[in-house]
């Protein structure tokens, strides 16, 4: 009954909406005895914006502790902090450790090099562009394309960086510290060659996948994957690792690192889970991924819900293979998105249970950090918006909201652990 009333836009029904929504948020899920819980699988907590820095300029002090408080007030229980480079992965490790006793959320992290950051495997002595980061692209496609030949002809620097990455993963893969939960964010991004070239992306996607197979400890970790406009190459690379293959060339001497692959044979563990996060592909792309393996799961956020075509694709994702995320501070749902129509239906009802957090411009936040109220920054996405993603997906798929939240929570915990 409440689902029907929530979709109504008739304000005369408001007196009925309040007790229904209040009951929904205070009750346990209809599908389980567990309370309402969200698990944000994509939180870029090391991003400069959460430390008050926008385009290289400091506007306010770091506010990520307040951000976590807001998330907890909106039923976010767990979050996966993403690493996009070796340095950022190290920062994620340190940040998760430093806020462990302060955070109302359980925070975990990934380790990996994003396709837009693979230039870091090129010799930094070749110039600042070689060490360009996710926040500072080279903006030079010709330069990016030149790096591949240099790296292959003189692989020693890349060998050292891959060993550094492998060592970092091994150091964190320890039974007494379970904050390291996934290898990633790794993959292919053919929309942003101004960050890195296709060939550099492909070779270091494969090398990182090889690293993930080098020993029994790492082979058990799920993969956190990125794919933009690259489905065919992405699937082809993953197919090789699912089937198993021998790398006789060993250009980067990975066989010296792990005893399990001293023969140069690489194959995913049959139970390994693969999460393609922030999915924005076509219906054809989706089917290729789902058909590749029953262990592939699809993560959706605001970027996955921009257009009517996006919504039609999300509708086709099996609920049991669906995960939710914000990819904060990016990928918010905007008024111009096709998905916003579904949020508008809920806004008045939602405000009965709890009003939306107020937001201010980034240059005004410093004055609000000591206030009792928790202020957001306009235009900056946060984990507290997980509910928005869930609402849109439940509407598009015509799945009961409580059931969707419960199912995605359980699926996420099976992959990354609770």
Curated annotation (Swiss-Prot):
Q: What keywords sit in the KW lines? A: Cytoplasm, Hydrolase, Metal-binding, Nuclease
- The name under which this protein is listed is Deoxyribonuclease Tat-D
Mind telling me which Pfam families this protein's record contains?
TatD_DNase
Q: What else is known?
A: Present with 1460 molecules/cell in log phase SD medium.
Q: How does activity depend on pH?
A: Optimum pH is 5.
This protein's superkingdom?
Answer: Eukaryota
- Top EC class for this record: hydrolase
Job of this protein: Has both endo- and exonuclease activities. Incises double-stranded DNA without obvious specificity via its endonuclease activity and excises the DNA from the 3'-to 5'-end by its exonuclease activity. May have a role in apoptosis.
**Origin species:** Saccharomyces cerevisiae (strain ATCC 204508 / S288c) (Baker's yeast)
The organism's taxonomy opens as: Eukaryota, Fungi, Dikarya, Ascomycota, Saccharomycotina
Q: CDD domains recorded for this chain?
A: TatD_DNAse
Q: Which GO terms describe its molecular function?
A: 3'-5'-DNA exonuclease activity; endonuclease activity; metal ion binding
The record's section on SUPFAM superfamilies has: Metallo-dependent hydrolases
């Amino acid at each position: 009954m409440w689902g029907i009333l929530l979709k109504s836009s008739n304000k005369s029904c408001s007196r009925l909406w309040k007790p229904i929504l209040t009951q929904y948020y205070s009750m346990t899920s209809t599908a389980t005895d567990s309370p309402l819980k969200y698990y944000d699988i994509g939180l870029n907590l090391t991003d400069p914006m959460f430390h008050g820095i926008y385009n290289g300029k400091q506007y306010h002090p770091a506010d990520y502790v307040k951000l976590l408080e807001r998330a907890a007030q909106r039923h976010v229980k767990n979050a996966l902090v993403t690493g996009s480079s070796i340095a950022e992965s190290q920062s994620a490790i340190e940040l998760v450790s430093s806020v462990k006793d302060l955070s109302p959320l359980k925070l975990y992290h990934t380790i990996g090099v994003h396709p837009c950051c693979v230039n870091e495997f090129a010799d930094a002595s070749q110039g600042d562009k070689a060490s360009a980061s996710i926040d500072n692209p080279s903006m030079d496609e010709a330069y990016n394309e030149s790096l591949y030949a240099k790296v292959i002809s003189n692989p020693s620097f890349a060998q050292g960086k891959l060993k550094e990455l492998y060592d970092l993963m091994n150091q964190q893969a320890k039974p007494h510290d379970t904050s390291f939960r996934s290898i990633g964010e790794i993959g292919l991004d053919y929309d942003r060659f101004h960050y890195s070239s296709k060939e550099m992306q492909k070779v270091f996607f494969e090398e990182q996948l090889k690293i993930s197979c080098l020993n029994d400890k790492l082979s058990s970790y799920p993969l956190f994957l990125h794919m933009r406009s690259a489905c065919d190459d992405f699937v082809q690379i993953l197919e090789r690792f699912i089937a198993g293959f021998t790398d006789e060339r060993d250009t980067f001497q990975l066989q010296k690192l792990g005893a399990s692959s001293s023969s140069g044979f690489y194959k995913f563990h049959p139970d390994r889970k693969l999460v393609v996060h922030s999915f924005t592909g076509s219906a054809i792309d989706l089917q290729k991924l789902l058909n590749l393996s029953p262990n592939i799961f699809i993560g959706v956020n605001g970027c996955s819900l921009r257009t009517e075509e996006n919504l039609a694709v999300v509708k086709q994702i099996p609920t049991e293979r669906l995960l939710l995320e914000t990819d904060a501070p990016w990928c918010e749902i905007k008024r111009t998105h096709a998905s916003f129509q579904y949020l508008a239906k809920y806004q008045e009802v939602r405000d009965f249970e709890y009003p939306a957090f107020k937001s201010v411009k980034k240059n005004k936040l410093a004055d609000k950090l000591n206030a009792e109220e928790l202020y957001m920054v306009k235009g900056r996405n946060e984990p507290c918006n997980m509910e928005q993603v869930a609402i849109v997906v439940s509407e598009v798929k015509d799945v009961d909201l409580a059931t969707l939240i419960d199912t995605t929570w359980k699926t996420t915990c099976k992959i990354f652990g609770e």
